[in-house]
Amino acid sequence: MTQSTSVSKGGRVSRKAKKNPDGTMSIVDHLRELRTRLLRALAAIAVTTIIGFIWYEHGIPAWAIGPLHVPRLPSLGEILKEPYCSLPPSARATFSADNECRLLATSPFEMFMLRMKMGGLAGLVMACPIWLIEIWRFITPGLLKNERRWTLSVGTIAGFLFVLGVVAAYLVLPMGLDVLLHLGDSTQISALTGEKYFNFVIALILVFGLSFEVPLFTAMLNLAGVVHYEQLKDKRRIMIVVIFIFAAIATPGQDPISMLVLALTLVVLMELALQFTRIHDRRAARHVSEWEGLSDDEASPLKVAPSSIPAAESIYDGDHKGIAGGGDAHPAGGSGPIPKPSPVTAPTRAPSASESPTPTPSPAPSDSPTSGSHHAPPAAVLRRGPRSWNDSTGDNDGKPGQDTIQSSSFDDVL
């Protein structure tokens, strides 16, 4: 990403960043982009926080546009305290003269801080479309087309499950409070403060909302190939027991109603996740290769049937004769007997013009009898150094074995 500088009519210098054609960005450009996204998200949260601060005490009046009539929207405080105020008057303390349901405040700044806290949470929820879009635009350039589609799908499902958990928590809250506040009503009467009550409501909403994401997390692990349906099916009973234990610990009120509602809802969602993994594994098994299930150091099976090697065919016909029969040598792959190698003769050097031919001495008679007219060839002498082959017996006082090598035939020398 590069920067272009331009000067306006008023003398102000404006710098605009130009994106590279290939989409690459430096670290400084990434930090600048992150700063821009964070500032936009924080600005949206600040605006919605102000709206939430006002909405905490004041509702939105009813209005109508033509045939469309919108009823009055209660204030945020009225919506949050409705589960508590829906209890019978005998289960809660009333301190106002008109018997209106209100929460207690035990410190001077409790009401202001509670209003700021609830306004900030409401602003964070109302601004979630904006800061989610900013996060999406920041991470999208680094994702492939397939990854963008999966991320958008997972994010949409996660948001739907969280909202479903929040609605379930809000519906189960009156039943949980009814059980808790009637356990010792013959001796005590409840007078909840605003801080403790709203903390209880927020904790219950977060527990339900985040717990509803567990089935989605299980499905994502199955898509990544970490867990499979056969593994989860064998541990279904253990999972149900773990879910009930988690619901008993996680619910802030520790009442049986909230625990049962959370546990039963999670069991249903986990069963849906298990059926998703079963369908996904069945579809993936149709397109899986045999080598995909092997480890990195295990050889894949090769289905190669052994085949016989055909015999080599000769380029000659059947009447061709070898060297022994007076014909030419067979090439590679030919058939026929292997011919006897021809004898090797001693190399000779032609005498130059300045040299006179030296008579070849007759060989010494051999004591061993010879058959026929076959005679041993003359002795050949191999001299060392730059000397050449010669038929004479050489120098060194006729001492063989020092500078000369004598043999009865050239075949013995070889």
Swiss-Prot record:
Residues 345-357 have a biased composition (Low complexity). InterPro entries: Sec-indep_translocase_CS, TatC. One of its GO terms (biological process) is intracellular protein transmembrane transport. Keywords: Cell membrane, Membrane, Protein transport, Translocation, Transmembrane, Transmembrane helix, Transport. It is a multi-pass membrane protein. Residues 403-414 have a biased composition (Polar residues). Its main location: membrane. One of its GO terms (cellular component) is TAT protein transport complex. It is found in: Cell membrane. The chain crosses the membrane at residues 45-65, 119-139, 157-177, 200-220, 238-258, 259-279. Belongs to the TatC family. Part of the twin-arginine translocation (Tat) system that transports large folded proteins containing a characteristic twin-arginine motif in their signal peptide across membranes. Together with TatB, TatC is part of a receptor directly interacting with Tat signal peptides. PANTHER family: SEC-INDEPENDENT PROTEIN TRANSLOCASE PROTEIN TATC, SEC-INDEPENDENT PROTEIN TRANSLOCASE PROTEIN TATC, CHLOROPLASTIC-RELATED. This is Sec-independent protein translocase protein TatC. It comes from Corynebacterium kroppenstedtii (strain DSM 44385 / JCM 11950 / CIP 105744 / CCUG 35717).
